[in-house]
Amino acid sequence: GVGFGKDALFTIWRWIIPRRVWYNINHTENAGADAHHRPVNLTAAAMCRGRTMSALTFSTQEGRAASIIIKGVFTMCTAATYTTDSFYFGRNLDYEFSYGDEVTVTPRAYPFSLRCMGDFRTKYAMIGMAYVAGEYPLYYDAVNEKGLGIAGLNFVGNAVYHPAQDGKSNVAQFELIPWLLGRCATVQDARTLLDRMNLVDTPFGEGLPVASLHWMIADNHECITLESTKDGLHVYDNPAGVLTNNPPFPMQLFALNNYMQLSPKATGNHFAPNVPLNAYSRGMGAMGLPGDLSSQSRFVRAAFVRANSRSGESEAESVSQFFHILGSVEQQRGCCELDNGKYEITLYTSCCNADKGIYYYTTYENSQITAVDMHKEDMDGTELVSYPLVKEQQIRWMK
C-alpha cells in the first residue's frame, strides 16, 4: 500500500503496485467514509536490487512527478482460530507502517483475471482486510460467506514458488485467497483444489518481487497450513489452530513438545521432594512459557493461550476473548527495533465471526472494536465495498 500523505516521497509494499492505483491523500487525518482518493499512474524506473528496490516514478492527475521507494517486507504476524458457539478466525498484522489497508467485501460473481488461467467469477462473497489496487483486492486475511477463512503470513527465506506446470492449476501468490475463497465452502473443498495447484512465481506488477508467504486455512471443523517450498507444495494438518512465520510449520509444531509440561493449574514440587519449595505466585504452572516476540516463541505462546482460553458463548464474550488471545502476542512500539531505527508494532488485529460474516478489528491507535457485517452489503452487487480503518482512538466519556 502507499504511504499516504501530500509529500512527494512514499513507501509501498513490494508486490501490490499495478499500472494504476488509488491512494488516500488524507489517510491519517480522515480515516472515515469521507476519505479522498486520487488516481496515480505508476511506471517502474528500475528493477529490484537485493532486498531494496530502486525508485518508481509516478505522475498524478495534476501532472506532478514524484518518487516511490520500495522495500522488502519482514512482517511478523500471528493468526489464530477459536470456537465457542460460533467459529472465529483472525490475525495480528505486525509491521512498522500501514499500507492503506481497508476492510473490503467482494461480492458473488466478482470477476478476477488469473495470470495463468484466465478469467473466473467468484461463487461466494468474502470479507477481509485488503489493499485494493485498482479494482483488485489484495487480501491479507479474509473469510467467505460459507465460513472458510484464509490468512497469509510472511515466510521469507523458505517460501519458493515455481514455474507454471502443464496439467496444474497455476495460481500466483496474490491470487490464492480470492481463488480459494471464491470457489470453496470448506477446508475439504480447498484440499481438493490444492491437490492439483501449483503456486507460480508471478508478481502482481512488472519488475516487482512476489511476497514470501505461507497460509493458514480453516473452517469450523478443521485447520490446515499451506506452504510452497523448494521441494514443492505441502498441506499440513494444523491441530494447534495458530500460525506465525518461520521456521516451516512442521518445526513450529514440533517445538510444542518442549512445553508439554506447562499447565494453567498451580504447580507442585516436582523438583526435589525433600527440599521445601513453595509456589509463591499464581501462574507458576506456565513457568517457561516464551514471552519474546520471535515467531517461534509467538507460536508457542499463542498455541498455549488459545488451547487454555475459556469464554462465555455470547458474541460479545467470544469476540472479547479472541482479542485477548491475540493480545498475548501483540507488539508494542519500542519493543522490536528495526535496522532503520523504526519499530515494528501490531498495526491491526482482526477477528471474524466466520459463521455470521462479521469482521471485527482494532488498530494500534484505536483499541475500540470496529465491525463490518458483510451480509448488510449487496453480496450480489458488481463492485467492491471498502471501509477505511477507524484509527483515531475512541474514548467513551462518562457524564
Language-model features and meaning:
Residues 8, 21, 35, 54-55, ...:
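Short, low-complexity intrinsically disordered segments enriched in A/P/G/S/L with frequent Arg
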Residues 13-15, 22:
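Tryptophan (W) side chains
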Residues 27, 37-38, 42, 59:
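Short hydrophobic targeting helices and cationic amphipathic motifs
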Residues 57, 61-75:
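Short, Lys/Arg-enriched N-terminal segments with co-localized hydrophobic residues
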Residues 70-88, 202-205, 210-211, 220-222, ...:
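C-terminus-biased signal that marks the final domain/tail of proteins
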Residues 74-168, 201, 386-388, 394, ...:
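A contiguous strand-loop segment
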Residues 167-203, 315-323:
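Proteins synthesized as precursors that undergo proteolytic processing into mature forms
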Residues 196-234:
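Catalytic cofactor-binding cores of redox enzymes
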